Amino acid sequence: MEVLVQLALLLVVHGSLVVLVAGKSVPRVIDQDLERYEPLEEEDHRGARVPFNLEETYDQSFRANSFNGTWKTDREILYSDNYVGDIRLFDVTTGSGTVLLDSSVTADFDKASVMFSFDNSHVAIGHDYVNGFRYSIHQKCTVYNIKSRTFTDIANGDRIPLFKWSPTRNALIYVHKNDIYYQVFFEGGSDTRRITNTGVPDIVFNGIPDWVYEEEVLGSPVAFWISPDGRHLAFATFNDTNVRDIVISKYGSPGNSRDQYPNEIRIKYPKAGTTNPFVSLSVIDLHDPSSKLIDLPPPVDVVGADNVLYTANWRRDGEIVATWTNRVQNKAQLVLYDTKGNANNIYYEEETEGWLRIQPPLYHDRYVIVAKLQDSGTKAGRFLHATRLEYRNGALVDETDLTPGTCEVISLLLVDHARARLYYLGTELGKPSHKNLYSVQLSGNEPPVCLSCDVLTPEGNRCTYAYAYFSTNGSHYALYCAGPDPVFIAIVNANHRQISIWEENRSLRRKLAARTQPIVKNFNVNANGYTNKVKLYLPPDFDETKKYPLLITVYAGPNTIRITEEATYGFESYIVTNRSVIYGRIDGRGSAYKGSKMLFEIYRRLGTVEIEDQIIITRTLQEKYSWIDSNRTGIWGWSYGGFSAAMVLATDAESVFKCGISVAPVTSWIYYDSLYTERFMGLPTPEDNQSGYNDTDVSRRVEGMRGKKYMLIHGTADDNVHYQQTMMLNKALVNSDIMFQQQTYTDEAHALGNVFPHLYHTTDRFWANCLGYSH
């Protein structure tokens, strides 16, 4: 649900070669040895710092280079030389590199990516891609035999949504027209085996998710899982036959006769309370050409027939573990299957106060590690912890909390089997905005150790927002520090000693040195029985004797946060330094990482408590700080944030906010997808929570928006939050004769990635009018 405006990433990929290993992809690399030759950028006005301008906050001027390699082995990283285009293999222990693939091989392919087979003898080249849904692309695939220098087109040269190499063979598993194929390469040719024959484009999906599973459950375009030995393939099938369509009109190019009639795009999209996809799980022996599909049935006696497949992965060769939930996702059953279809229900979990937050489990010998809410011993309630269970006599027993206290596990990353250690991302004590890399012994005898907390950025500040990319077995990792300063990446060994610098983003740092920066202040504000986090960006020349307009950016979706330590240089940098507007973020009830009590306040009542907090906390700031101009206070948000902005204006009886913008907003939860909405709201039926849906429908509350300046912005081709949402609010406002502005972007999707100049110039004019600065 959360909007991920991926324009920057897309532009990088469009102009670059991408390296992939085992389905992972990263942008093209700038050769570390060559970065020193980048010319120094001249500072503006003979060294004087200048404000950010609007255009450079959306045109990638201040985009950081990311980790632009992919681990191939436990000590080697694949990357693309940015200057000559060769694919190189870099040994982090010796500092030496070798060329694996000459740039001439991919020179004739458009928008190329490469994925190497297990022994580097074959290369799958993805090219000529078009975007699918949020995470998926459809591309042509050509396999190059390095020894014979021959090319083989996959799927007759058609675009395909997914391909992966076997981990142990020169064999490619791919999906074509929603069926799975297995193609084995050998000297002189290849053999192809069709694994499924039930696929129907846009209706029955084998090995890839449909729209709702890609967006809301898997967060990935991948729905097949290869066993570690490469012998077996488990995969999901999504049957959308009974799922209703959303119809999107694509209008095409102005004046083009081919677009005399709009083109209709139909997408299977289950809305709240409607029929969901029917999902099944299967496994097959890839090495035995005569093998048949084996069904891995869901535990319908526990989660019901209308269930959700949340996770699936291999515990070890021959054993796959799947997590199934009921439709509203508050009951979950872990099932252990063997490759003959035998099933064993090994662990059950139920959440009575809210919804389940499920992550794929990790494994070590007899241990299974899951993320589970555990009591913190404080009034904040339970926190998501790494929890170790032992598989014994067909069940998971002996639960051990590996990360006790009031810190939250954000993501389980990897188990280092040689050292019996778990790596994970988590918050810091009392600091939910911090994201650190931790490790903890699986024995449970030692407290977690923060591995990123003592790492210093080039500016000398402690790293407070980290991620890690691990090598095959976890003996090395790339530590990615994204805050509080620009991205800095170091290569670290298993003893947690930094052995090299991968990326310092020196060019970005030089450019930032020529810009004035906001003054950042963090506050705790007590409201509605909780301590709420507030972050304000103040103008560089801030004077507390003056009054400044305030603009709040809001998301406020369940289990999300807006206040983090990540360094960003977006719209806030412009409006604060160039327009002297205070920019604010508020994390109230329903936000993440502060305990289950605060989190589950939002359960079954979206659009209530999180909206109240935005209003009351902003009013508190206005009353406490004389330098905030209460007559020039606005709010804006995108996606769920657009919903929040609209609901704030509709329910703000005291007119704390004078104006607002909603970009691609939900306006009624009956129009949004089932798997997201029902997780937090239940079903829109009289027997369940129909009244909750009605209470949170913005179109039923438009009278509260009268007299306030409001702008609606939406793209007509939004496959996530449909244009219908905005049109229904439009109709309610018009029927009530309430004035508002609307900007429609023809054929634009949820991210509005093709119209940023017009979008931000439009919003800038709106804010100039509302907040009182000259445009």
UniProtKB/Swiss-Prot annotation:
InterPro entries referenced in this protein's UniProt entry, alphabetically: AB_hydrolase_fold, Peptidase_S9_cat, Peptidase_S9B_N, Serine_Prot_S9B/DPPIV
Organism: Apis mellifera (Honeybee)
Active site per database record: S639, D718, H750
Residues carrying sugar: N68, N239, N473, N505, N578, N631, N689, N694
UniProt xrefs under Gene3D superfamilies: alpha/beta hydrolase, Dipeptidylpeptidase IV, N-terminal domain
Activity control: Inhibited by diprotin A.
CC per GO annotation: extracellular region; plasma membrane
Lineage, opening ranks: Eukaryota, Metazoa, Ecdysozoa, Arthropoda, Hexapoda
Tissues where the protein occurs: Expressed by the venom duct.
Protein name: Venom dipeptidyl peptidase 4
Example GO BP: proteolysis
